[in-house]
């Protein structure tokens, strides 16, 4: 439980962090026109201009002035995000915020603060997962900056992240993390496919769709794992802690083997490395579920809208 003093400190840090991200921005076109700007950065910024226009005119998203100005960051992430779950539960801890309501993560603009808070939660017995967010969204309250951390991935990944964040800006259901993230994930994926199709990039479209099929296969594995682990905790809740801990450890070892088998099936040496080579716990399992588990539902809704973005958004807002 946060004390009043620590809450004030957190919000003070949040205000300062927000100002650091939103001041000192440069219009994208000005960066492009600068002869000192590297070729790759110019390409990415020109792509963002194209994607913003597509998002507004074809996807019916609220673009406004979001991501129209560039900000370079000398760090790998915009925000460090802490997720926590009890030692024997797959349900994430929630925190309350003034604008978005309850949210199942806590973000920090300083990595050191995120690590300190993670250590505090671990000391209280929680499983903790510390992730990095490369994008930043104020849900339409401000004109969000295009951060350099945005631009490390492929064109398709950049498009997906941009469409995801603009989806949040367009519609956000207060207090329902899984709804918002799964909806934004599903809509962004459909948006990328429409964009590639309009450009006539059929080979890239097929490659992207192959990636989505792999993600969907992993989503099924993740959903099954979360369900099974939840049942283990429920059915053994009265067992000694040592017994619970052993079963938990055995479960995650088995889960890693399943991920390794998927990697072999896909013939991709780097696939799922965050699940195979790094620690996996309740918090990481549950955090990933937020973004994936309801995606099939929102994908099905896309079919009900006959693939029309405007109709789709109207259907989502009625849910």
What are these regions (language model features)?
Residues 18-55:
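Amphipathic alpha-helical packing elements
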Residues 50-215:
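Acidic/His-rich structured neighborhood in mature extracellular/periplasmic domains
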Residues 10-15, 210-217, 279-286:
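A ubiquitous short alpha-helical element
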Residues 41-42, 51, 62-81, 93, ...:
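A well-structured
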Residues 33-37, 50-60, 167-171, 188-200, ...:
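Sec-exported extracytoplasmic/periplasmic mature domains
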Residues 220-319:
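Pan-zinc metallopeptidase signature
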Residues 4-26:
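Bacterial Sec signal peptide processing site at the extreme N-terminus
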Residues 42-45, 49, 114-118, 159-164, ...:
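Extracytoplasmic/secreted envelope proteins and their assembly/folding machinery
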